[in-house]
Amino acid sequence: MATNAANRTNIFSFIPKSISSEVFLVWLINYLDSDCKYGQYKQSFFDNLLLKRDDKGKLVSEISINRQSNNMETVLSFHFNASDERQDILLLFVDKESDMVRPEQLDRYKWIYPNCYRYIYYKTGYVTTIEEQTVSQNQYDLVTDGMMESVLESISELHPLIRIYTDYLNSEVEAFNYYHERLFLNHDKEILHDSAAQKYLLDTLLENIAEDNWSIKIE
């Protein structure tokens, strides 16, 4: 598979994805905040990914990041238009190989970090409809690889590392499109020798069973 071949030359393919996503985003935000010449790119990144729709365009300042060691959460703090009120965003990084975070866990994070400006659930990899519904019902905002790739594409030429990470996300998105085509359009059972394809198939079947949808067919 071409996508897997491309990934073997990408540094991010050698790190657990939830860790690489967190480390990259922490680096990126600090990088964009390091020099005023990046101001418009920082604002674009916040507008397109982190701010609520009604707050897009508000200037972001006094950024700080608090990473929680041995946990999946990172707290991003900032101020609007140099105001005194601090805004906190809780970012949860969920690995593609892990089960989705359960509702009680999502509630627990809200109890630990109350009154956040936003609660963001960043799932690296395939997101089932069930997982998407669980995240929404618990009032978290879902961010996917495809969404992140789209946001980063506009600033990817700023630094080689941004381009590398964007390419990696693109290869991950293409992989799931590839599995879907081979399994459900071409009815190719040989792809099931790939463990990632097996996981994609199981997730898809569980999702359709939960929705009482029996239209999936592999000949």
Please place each PLM-identified region on the residue numbering.
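Charged, terminal alpha-helix-loop-beta segments
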Residues: 1-219
